């Protein structure tokens, strides 16, 4: 969880979009799990992961068949809120995971996602995907879900729609701050080269809220 991730989650809390009962997918790392925070705020929350952890109530592989998942969670479902934060990039079949999570949501429930669109590789244990805005838009269309456009954001930059161009979803430009940025820019100008970090940021995550219709 980055600072921008936390800001996004706090925004959703302010808007009262995170409600009981809630499931956090990927809660094994106790330093970044939201289970204690939500429970302390009166939002009944349980955690799940592939391995044991302080805030893991159920060990579940969400890439498995939904028939194997439902019996594990039968006493808790359906959920009003499911959070899947910084998980999808570490899976082989993110669509299978999303399909399973949607089936665990109540009608009108919220699926909250955060995943990188541009980010250095970081295996945990594997790193497979960088999901673009069009992926979420198409998925929501095919599964009859509604994306809140005001909350469909490049975290730390702004709404995804504000960066769209004809025939392109668009990426935020790098934040132009810090001595290193200007030093690097000068060096690239002297040697007539193009620095990748001057074309677009190499740390971009997308946050969004999908509602089950």
Q: What kind of region is each of these model predictions?
A:
Residues 1-17:
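Class I SAM-dependent methyltransferase Rossmann-like catalytic core
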Residues 15-16, 20-122, 134-137, 208-210:
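Conserved SAM-binding loop
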Residues 92-106, 110-213:
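S-adenosyl-L-methionine-dependent methyltransferase catalytic module, highlighting the catalytic core
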């Amino acid at each position: 969880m980055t600072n921008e991730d936390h800001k996004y989650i706090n925004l959703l809390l302010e808007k009262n979009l995170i409600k009981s009962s809630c499931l956090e997918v990927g809660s094994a790392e106790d330093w970044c799990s939201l289970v204690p925070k939500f429970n302390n705020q009166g939002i009944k929350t349980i955690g799940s992961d592939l391995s044991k952890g302080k805030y893991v109530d159920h060990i579940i592989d969400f890439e498995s068949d939904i028939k194997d998942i439902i019996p594990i969670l039968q006493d808790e479902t359906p959920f009003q809120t499911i959070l899947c934060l910084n998980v999808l990039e570490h899976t082989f079949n993110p669509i299978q995971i999303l399909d399973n999570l949607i089936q665990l949501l109540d009608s009108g429930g919220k699926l909250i996602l955060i995943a990188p669109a541009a980010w250095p590789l970081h295996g945990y244990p594997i790193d497979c995907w960088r999901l673009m805005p069009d992926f979420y838009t198409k998925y929501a269309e095919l599964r009859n879900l509604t994306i809140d456009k005001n909350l469909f954001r490049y975290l730390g930059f702004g709404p995804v729609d504000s960066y769209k161009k004809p025939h392109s979803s668009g990426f935020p430009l790098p934040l132009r701050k810090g001595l290193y940025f200007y030093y690097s820019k000068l060096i690239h100008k002297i040697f007539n080269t193009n620095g990748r970090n001057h074309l677009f940021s190499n740390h971009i995550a997308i946050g969004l809220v999908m509602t089950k219709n």
